[in-house]
Amino acid sequence: MSAHAKQKRLTTASIRQMKGEARIVCLTAYTTPIARLLDPHCDLLLVGDSLGMVLYGMETTVGVTLDMMIAHGRAVMRGVEHACVIVDLPFGTYQESKEQAFRNAVRLMQETGCDGVKLEGGEEMAETIAFLVARGIPVFGHVGLMPQLVHTAGGFRSLGHSDAETQKIWRDGIAVDQAGAFAIVVEGTVEPLARELTEKLAAPTVGIGASPACDGQVLVSDDMLGLFSDFKPKFVKRYADLGTAATQAAAAYADEVRSGAFPGPEHTFQVRKPSPSGK
């Protein structure tokens, strides 16, 4: 094999095998440049429907379309050489029937080249997940807080504080695991419950606002990088403040344009003088 042979990307099977062996690192990515920056450091890159809020200024993820997810999925795939890439099925593209879910998941995978799809839902989606997995579509499950159901769930809030919530999330996790999801996002769930799910389920859990005991963690990259400032969830740790850096850079640019300092001679093309030989 050539020393320059392209390294194979991680697969959904690789991610599943990490349970109990290594913590899974997952971040969201929506564009080629960001995917290139994150790829060397991540096991999983998620093209999340959160792009509706952090890129398009929507109040929820409900308005995101399949065409939007395909466009951003393609962009991310162009920037990835290492990580496994999963793309969200957006609201309304899989809930009607397992056949609808299959058609849209096939389109998503064929048109982006991604490694699998993510969908939200527990017991009510278990049959759909099993249907997709049996037909060759890897599924990343999602239980606990489900952003696509924000209008019926009473907003964005942590879950598992009551017996009813605990039992629902527990049943959901078991159902999605038994349906064959290769991994499961556990979102906005109290620590003891997330820990118990992680210990019980065969599939690795990837927490967001859940427990450090989860098999991995995911954050929205724009939150982690300090690019999204509309609100900051309790579970977000900001590792950079790129929003402030961008604002400061724009202000410096504006000052230099208005003062005439930019562009300077080093940024300006001049007419080349012909050489004495005429060449």
UniProtKB/Swiss-Prot annotation:
BP terms from Gene Ontology: pantothenate biosynthetic process
Catalytic reaction equation(s): 3-methyl-2-oxobutanoate + (6R)-5,10-methylene-5,6,7,8-tetrahydrofolate + H2O = 2-dehydropantoate + (6S)-5,6,7,8-tetrahydrofolate
Binding-site list for 3-methyl-2-oxobutanoate: 49-50, 88, 118
Catalytic class of the enzyme: transferase
One Pfam family here: Pantoate_transf
A GO-annotated cellular component: cytoplasm
UniProt-annotated binding residues for Mg(2+): 49, 88, 120
Pathway the protein contributes to: Cofactor biosynthesis; (R)-pantothenate biosynthesis; (R)-pantoate from 3-methyl-2-oxobutanoate: step 1/2
TM ranges: none
PANTHER family, per database record: 3-METHYL-2-OXOBUTANOATE HYDROXYMETHYLTRANSFERASE
NCBIfam families: panB, PRK00311.1
SUBUNIT field: Homodecamer; pentamer of dimers.
Entry protein name: 3-methyl-2-oxobutanoate hydroxymethyltransferase
